Design a protein with these regions (language model features):
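Extracellular "leader-to-stem" segments immediately downstream of a signal peptide or signal-anchor
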Residues: 2-28, 40-120, 124-213, 218-220, ...
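Glycine-centered low-complexity coil/loop motifs and glycine-rich tracts
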Residues: 332-335, 364-367, 392, 430-432, ...
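Active-site glycine-centered loops adjacent to acidic/histidine catalytic or metal-binding residues
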Residues: 8, 34, 281
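Accessory end-domains appended to solenoid repeat scaffolds used in host defense
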Residues: 402-408, 413, 424-432, 478-484
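Right-handed parallel beta-helix
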Residues: 125-126, 150-159, 215-225, 238-250, ...
Length: 519
């Protein structure tokens, strides 16, 4: 039996009969086609306050610097691969004790550029490194690559451009620039976004930047644009400082995460602006080869981005994130432990295209990781559908017997959250016999988007224990405020939520929760 409180057409009934049969629901996806380089209005965010984040007049000591123009580079010619020339300049700088390699005087098309120890890559104002459109020019699945290096840096105020449009398929629909005329159910909102995704073409080269097993790494005063996949992949590194970086991606290119910290510790991300299609800032820690997420393309050479140890001491503050999916996320790849994470004084939003972003804050352990001591505070959101999604499941994406049922989420503190135009309640979801522990939420001020409430009644919300974890996969939840299932020691204090005026849903729905405190 399905009871609808709005909508009486047969087509609406048929579209939502999947409430009882979730396996019948399939995500929209385009698998084949030609490269589609055209840019629609709404693909890029056109109001990035670069002057707030980028210092175009930053003084830099260029005494004894190495200039790429002395190594035969040819600017402003998209048919020329300048990677060999730039790599020769970097090698020369490294072999003479290190220093600064200067990219100036134009835009340089490149395949993979390799950083080396004790070298800072400086991209001057009005200059850039631009990804070649020939996938054969990339030898390590990234435009900028470093491995086993120390004391390296990349700075601007110039740009690194990934040319993501040239490695993607045509979307089914162009960006939606106006709100929907009526309230859609959560699953339909998910599909409306997916119809606008530029899914990967088989030629996709990989990351804009992959920095692997490096120590003492700095990215600062730099503009990154139009990544074809993850923009910054910091993998198995230690002592990382990312500051005053502006990321401006096409907001419909699949898997174009902003900053992904994978298996790395002692990381600071501050004063950054990120506008992207996929996760804004993500923390991941997995054992095996990455497949680049739910819609990922296994990139050539089966690139190993394996993380081999627990990660800790991550501090993120004073950042702005525009994301069509998750603004801040722990997950999904989570087979090894993540702990001691602080996120504060950030803004998460998506206010100029529709539908809303998936979630503002997402904390997940789905492959066996112990996620512990996560502290998030002073966050403002607008048009992020779910303000907070905490999910413990048992996907075990690495297929390791020792990880089966090992995962934990404990000691989570989220305070002082203000969010407008939400669509989904706070969700805290473990699985049977495997609970989330010790979650403290305090001082939330949440307001639903305008419109009539959409509501479908189901006797049972599926566990989806082995599925990809995302809040909108559970469709409409029968509570507007808080949904808690399989949890213990949960504290909710001063959680204010303004629902839609006509809602039939109750404030909370609690299933299998021990020691719940509401003040």
């Amino acid at each position: 039996m399905i009871i609808y409180f709005r909508g009486d057409s047969v087509s609406r009934f048929i579209n939502h009969i999947g409430s009882f049969f979730p396996k019948l629901q399939k995500d929209f996806k385009i698998y084949t086609g030609d490269i589609f380089p055209d840019v629609y209005v709404g693909d890029f965010y056109d109001k990035i306050p670069y002057e707030k984040y980028i210092n175009y007049n930053l003084s830099f000591n260029l005494d004894n610097a190495t200039y790429v123009k002395d190594f035969g580079v040819i600017p402003d010619n998209s048919c020329v691969n300048n990677a060999i020339c730039i790599n020769n300049a970097i090698t020369k700088c490294n072999e003479t004790g290190g220093g600064v390699v200067v990219v100036s005087g134009g835009n340089y098309t490149c395949g993979t550029v390799y950083l080396k120890s004790n070298v800072i890559l400086y991209i001057d104002k009005d200059s850039s490194i631009v990804a070649s459109h020939n996938t054969n020019d990339f030898t390590d699945n990234a435009l900028i690559y470093a491995e086993n290096c120390e004391n390296i840096g990349i700075t601007g105020p110039g740009k690194i451009c990934g040319e993501g449009n040239y490695f993607s398929l045509k979307p089914y629909c162009p960006p939606k620039l106006e709100p929907f005329s009526e309230t859609l159910d959560v699953w339909s909102l998910r599909q409306e976004y997916r119809k606008r995704i530029r899914f990967p073409h088989k030629t996709k080269y990989g990351y804009l930047m992959l920095l692997k097993n490096c120590n003492n790494l700095k990215l600062y005063n730099l503009i990154l644009e139009n990544s074809a996949m993850w923009t910054v992949n910091i993998n198995s590194c230690n002592s990382v400082d990312i500051s005053n970086v502006a990321i401006n991606n096409n907001r419909h290119v699949a898997n174009s995460d902003g900053i992904d910290i994978c298996g790395s510790s002692n990381v600071v991300i501050k004063d950054c602006f990120i506008s992207t299609a996929d996760d804004g800032i993500a923390l991941k820690n997995n054992m095996s080869v990455s497949t680049s997420g739910d819609d990922g393309l296994k990139i050539k050479n089966n690139l190993d981005v394996t993380c081999r140890k627990g990660m800790s001491n991550i501090y993120i503050h004073d950042c702005e994130v525009i994301s069509c999916t998750n603004a801040f996320k722990i997950g999904t790849e989570t087979s090894l432990d993540i702990s001691d994470v602080t996120v504060e004084n950030c803004k998460f939003y998506l206010t100029d295209i529709y539908p809303a972003g998936v979630s503002g804050i997402s904390i997940e352990s789905c492959d066996g990781a112990k996620v512990n001591n996560i502290n998030i505070s002073n966050i403002e959101m607008n048009s992020m559908a779910c303000p907070l999604f905490i999910r413990l499941c048992n996907r075990n994406g690495d297929n390791k017997p020792e990880l089966e049922g090992r995962g934990e989420i404990t000691n989570i503190s989220v305070n002082n959250i203000k969010a407008d135009n939400i669509e989904i309640p706070i969700m805290i979801m473990g699985i049977p016999n495997h609970k989330i522990h010790d979650v403290n939420l305090k001082n939330f001020d949440l307001r639903y988007a305008e419109g009539k409430d959409y509501y479908d009644f189901r006797f049972k919300i599926p566990e989806q224990e082995k599925e990809y974890p995302e809040c909108n996969r559970f469709r409409n939840i029968n509570a507007y405020g808080v949904f808690v299932r399989h949890a213990e020691n949960i504290s909710l204090e001063n959680i204010k939520i303004k629902p839609r005026k006509n809602t039939f849903r109750k404030y909370k729905k609690i299933i299998d929760c021990k020691n719940l405190s509401i003040k």
